[in-house]
Amino acid sequence: MDRPAAGAVSLLLTTPRAFVRRRVLARLPGARPANPLQGRRILVTGASSGIGEATARLCADRGATVLLVARRADALERVRAEIEASGGTAYAHPCDLTDPDSVDALVRDALDAHGGVDMLVNNAGRSIRRSIRLSWDRMHDFERTMAINYFAPVRLMLGLLPGMVERGDGHVVNVLTWGVQVKAPKFAAYIASKTALDTWSRIAGRELYAYGVTFSNVRMALVRTDMIGPTEAYAKLPALTPEQAAAKVVRALEDRPLTINVLPGSLAEIFNLVAPRLSDAVFSMVDRRFPDSAAARGQAHAAESGPAGLSAEGSTNQARERRVAP
């Protein structure tokens, strides 16, 4: 990581809340340790590259035992070996998160091998950018997106949450998108699946609050990854590096905020609430200004992106792991 990027990551990690926790709250009786990740067992999905890999490295640097999850065993082994070589502790758990039996096996392996999971980062996912007008006969786009973005993390949480409840402590971080606030055109499949996970976790957080289990939804802005390459409109837009995005995830693990938003997303949410029809008109113009990609129109297929317009995000266990948030 170059020096400017390292400085930005450091700034993101040093929030006022973190400063108070480390300098004030840590001295109070019964307070969490100044380094709340030390000794924690943290499972990170989509950990073979991108945000997931960067998150795993940051967690290991803070003394956590990291359980690396993705489909590609070779990529996971590389990340595990590099973390171990840097003095950290990591274990590779290859898993196809789109396969329910594989997820159930992952839960059993994590519980048997490590005695439980203290914190979970639901980072793996899939993004599709395609107009609904081009999706009349593509129900499978919505099914595939829900499978990895919603059903997989819910199944994983249902397997790991009982142990957290029994111990009276646990935390789940969901890597989402500011699109859940913006409701950006052409991302119906992607944003709907992320919104489902956002809502599920908010409700679970209320039900499990009394048991010491909390949830954070990180509504991520655009992240500079390979996946945004086919979308020319993104080329000149500002974007986070995977390391900067991972710093937000680590902040969520350490400080346990309810949500981490970005200002444009919050402003768009207010706009949608205060002037919904005007918002529709504005986003309709945006929709026409940025047309579907050639891949989404079925004219070409991006390398390693699967069906037209379908790409992996969040360093998930797909053909090539990477992430984007509209």
What does each of the following model-derived ranges do?
Residues 1-38, 281-326:
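Non-catalytic terminal and boundary segments that flank Rossmann-like NAD(P)-dependent oxidoreductase
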Residues 48-49:
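Conserved glycine-rich cofactor-binding loop
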Residues 157, 193:
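Active-site helix of classical SDR
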Residues 62-78:
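Conserved glycine-rich Rossmann-like NAD(P)H-binding loop of the short-chain dehydrogenase/reductase
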Residues 94-106, 139:
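The beta1-alpha1 cofactor-binding region of Rossmann-like NAD(H)/NADP(H)-dependent oxidoreductases
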Residues 217, 234-273:
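C-terminal helical subdomain
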Residues 127-143, 186:
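Conserved mid-core segment of classical short-chain dehydrogenase/reductases
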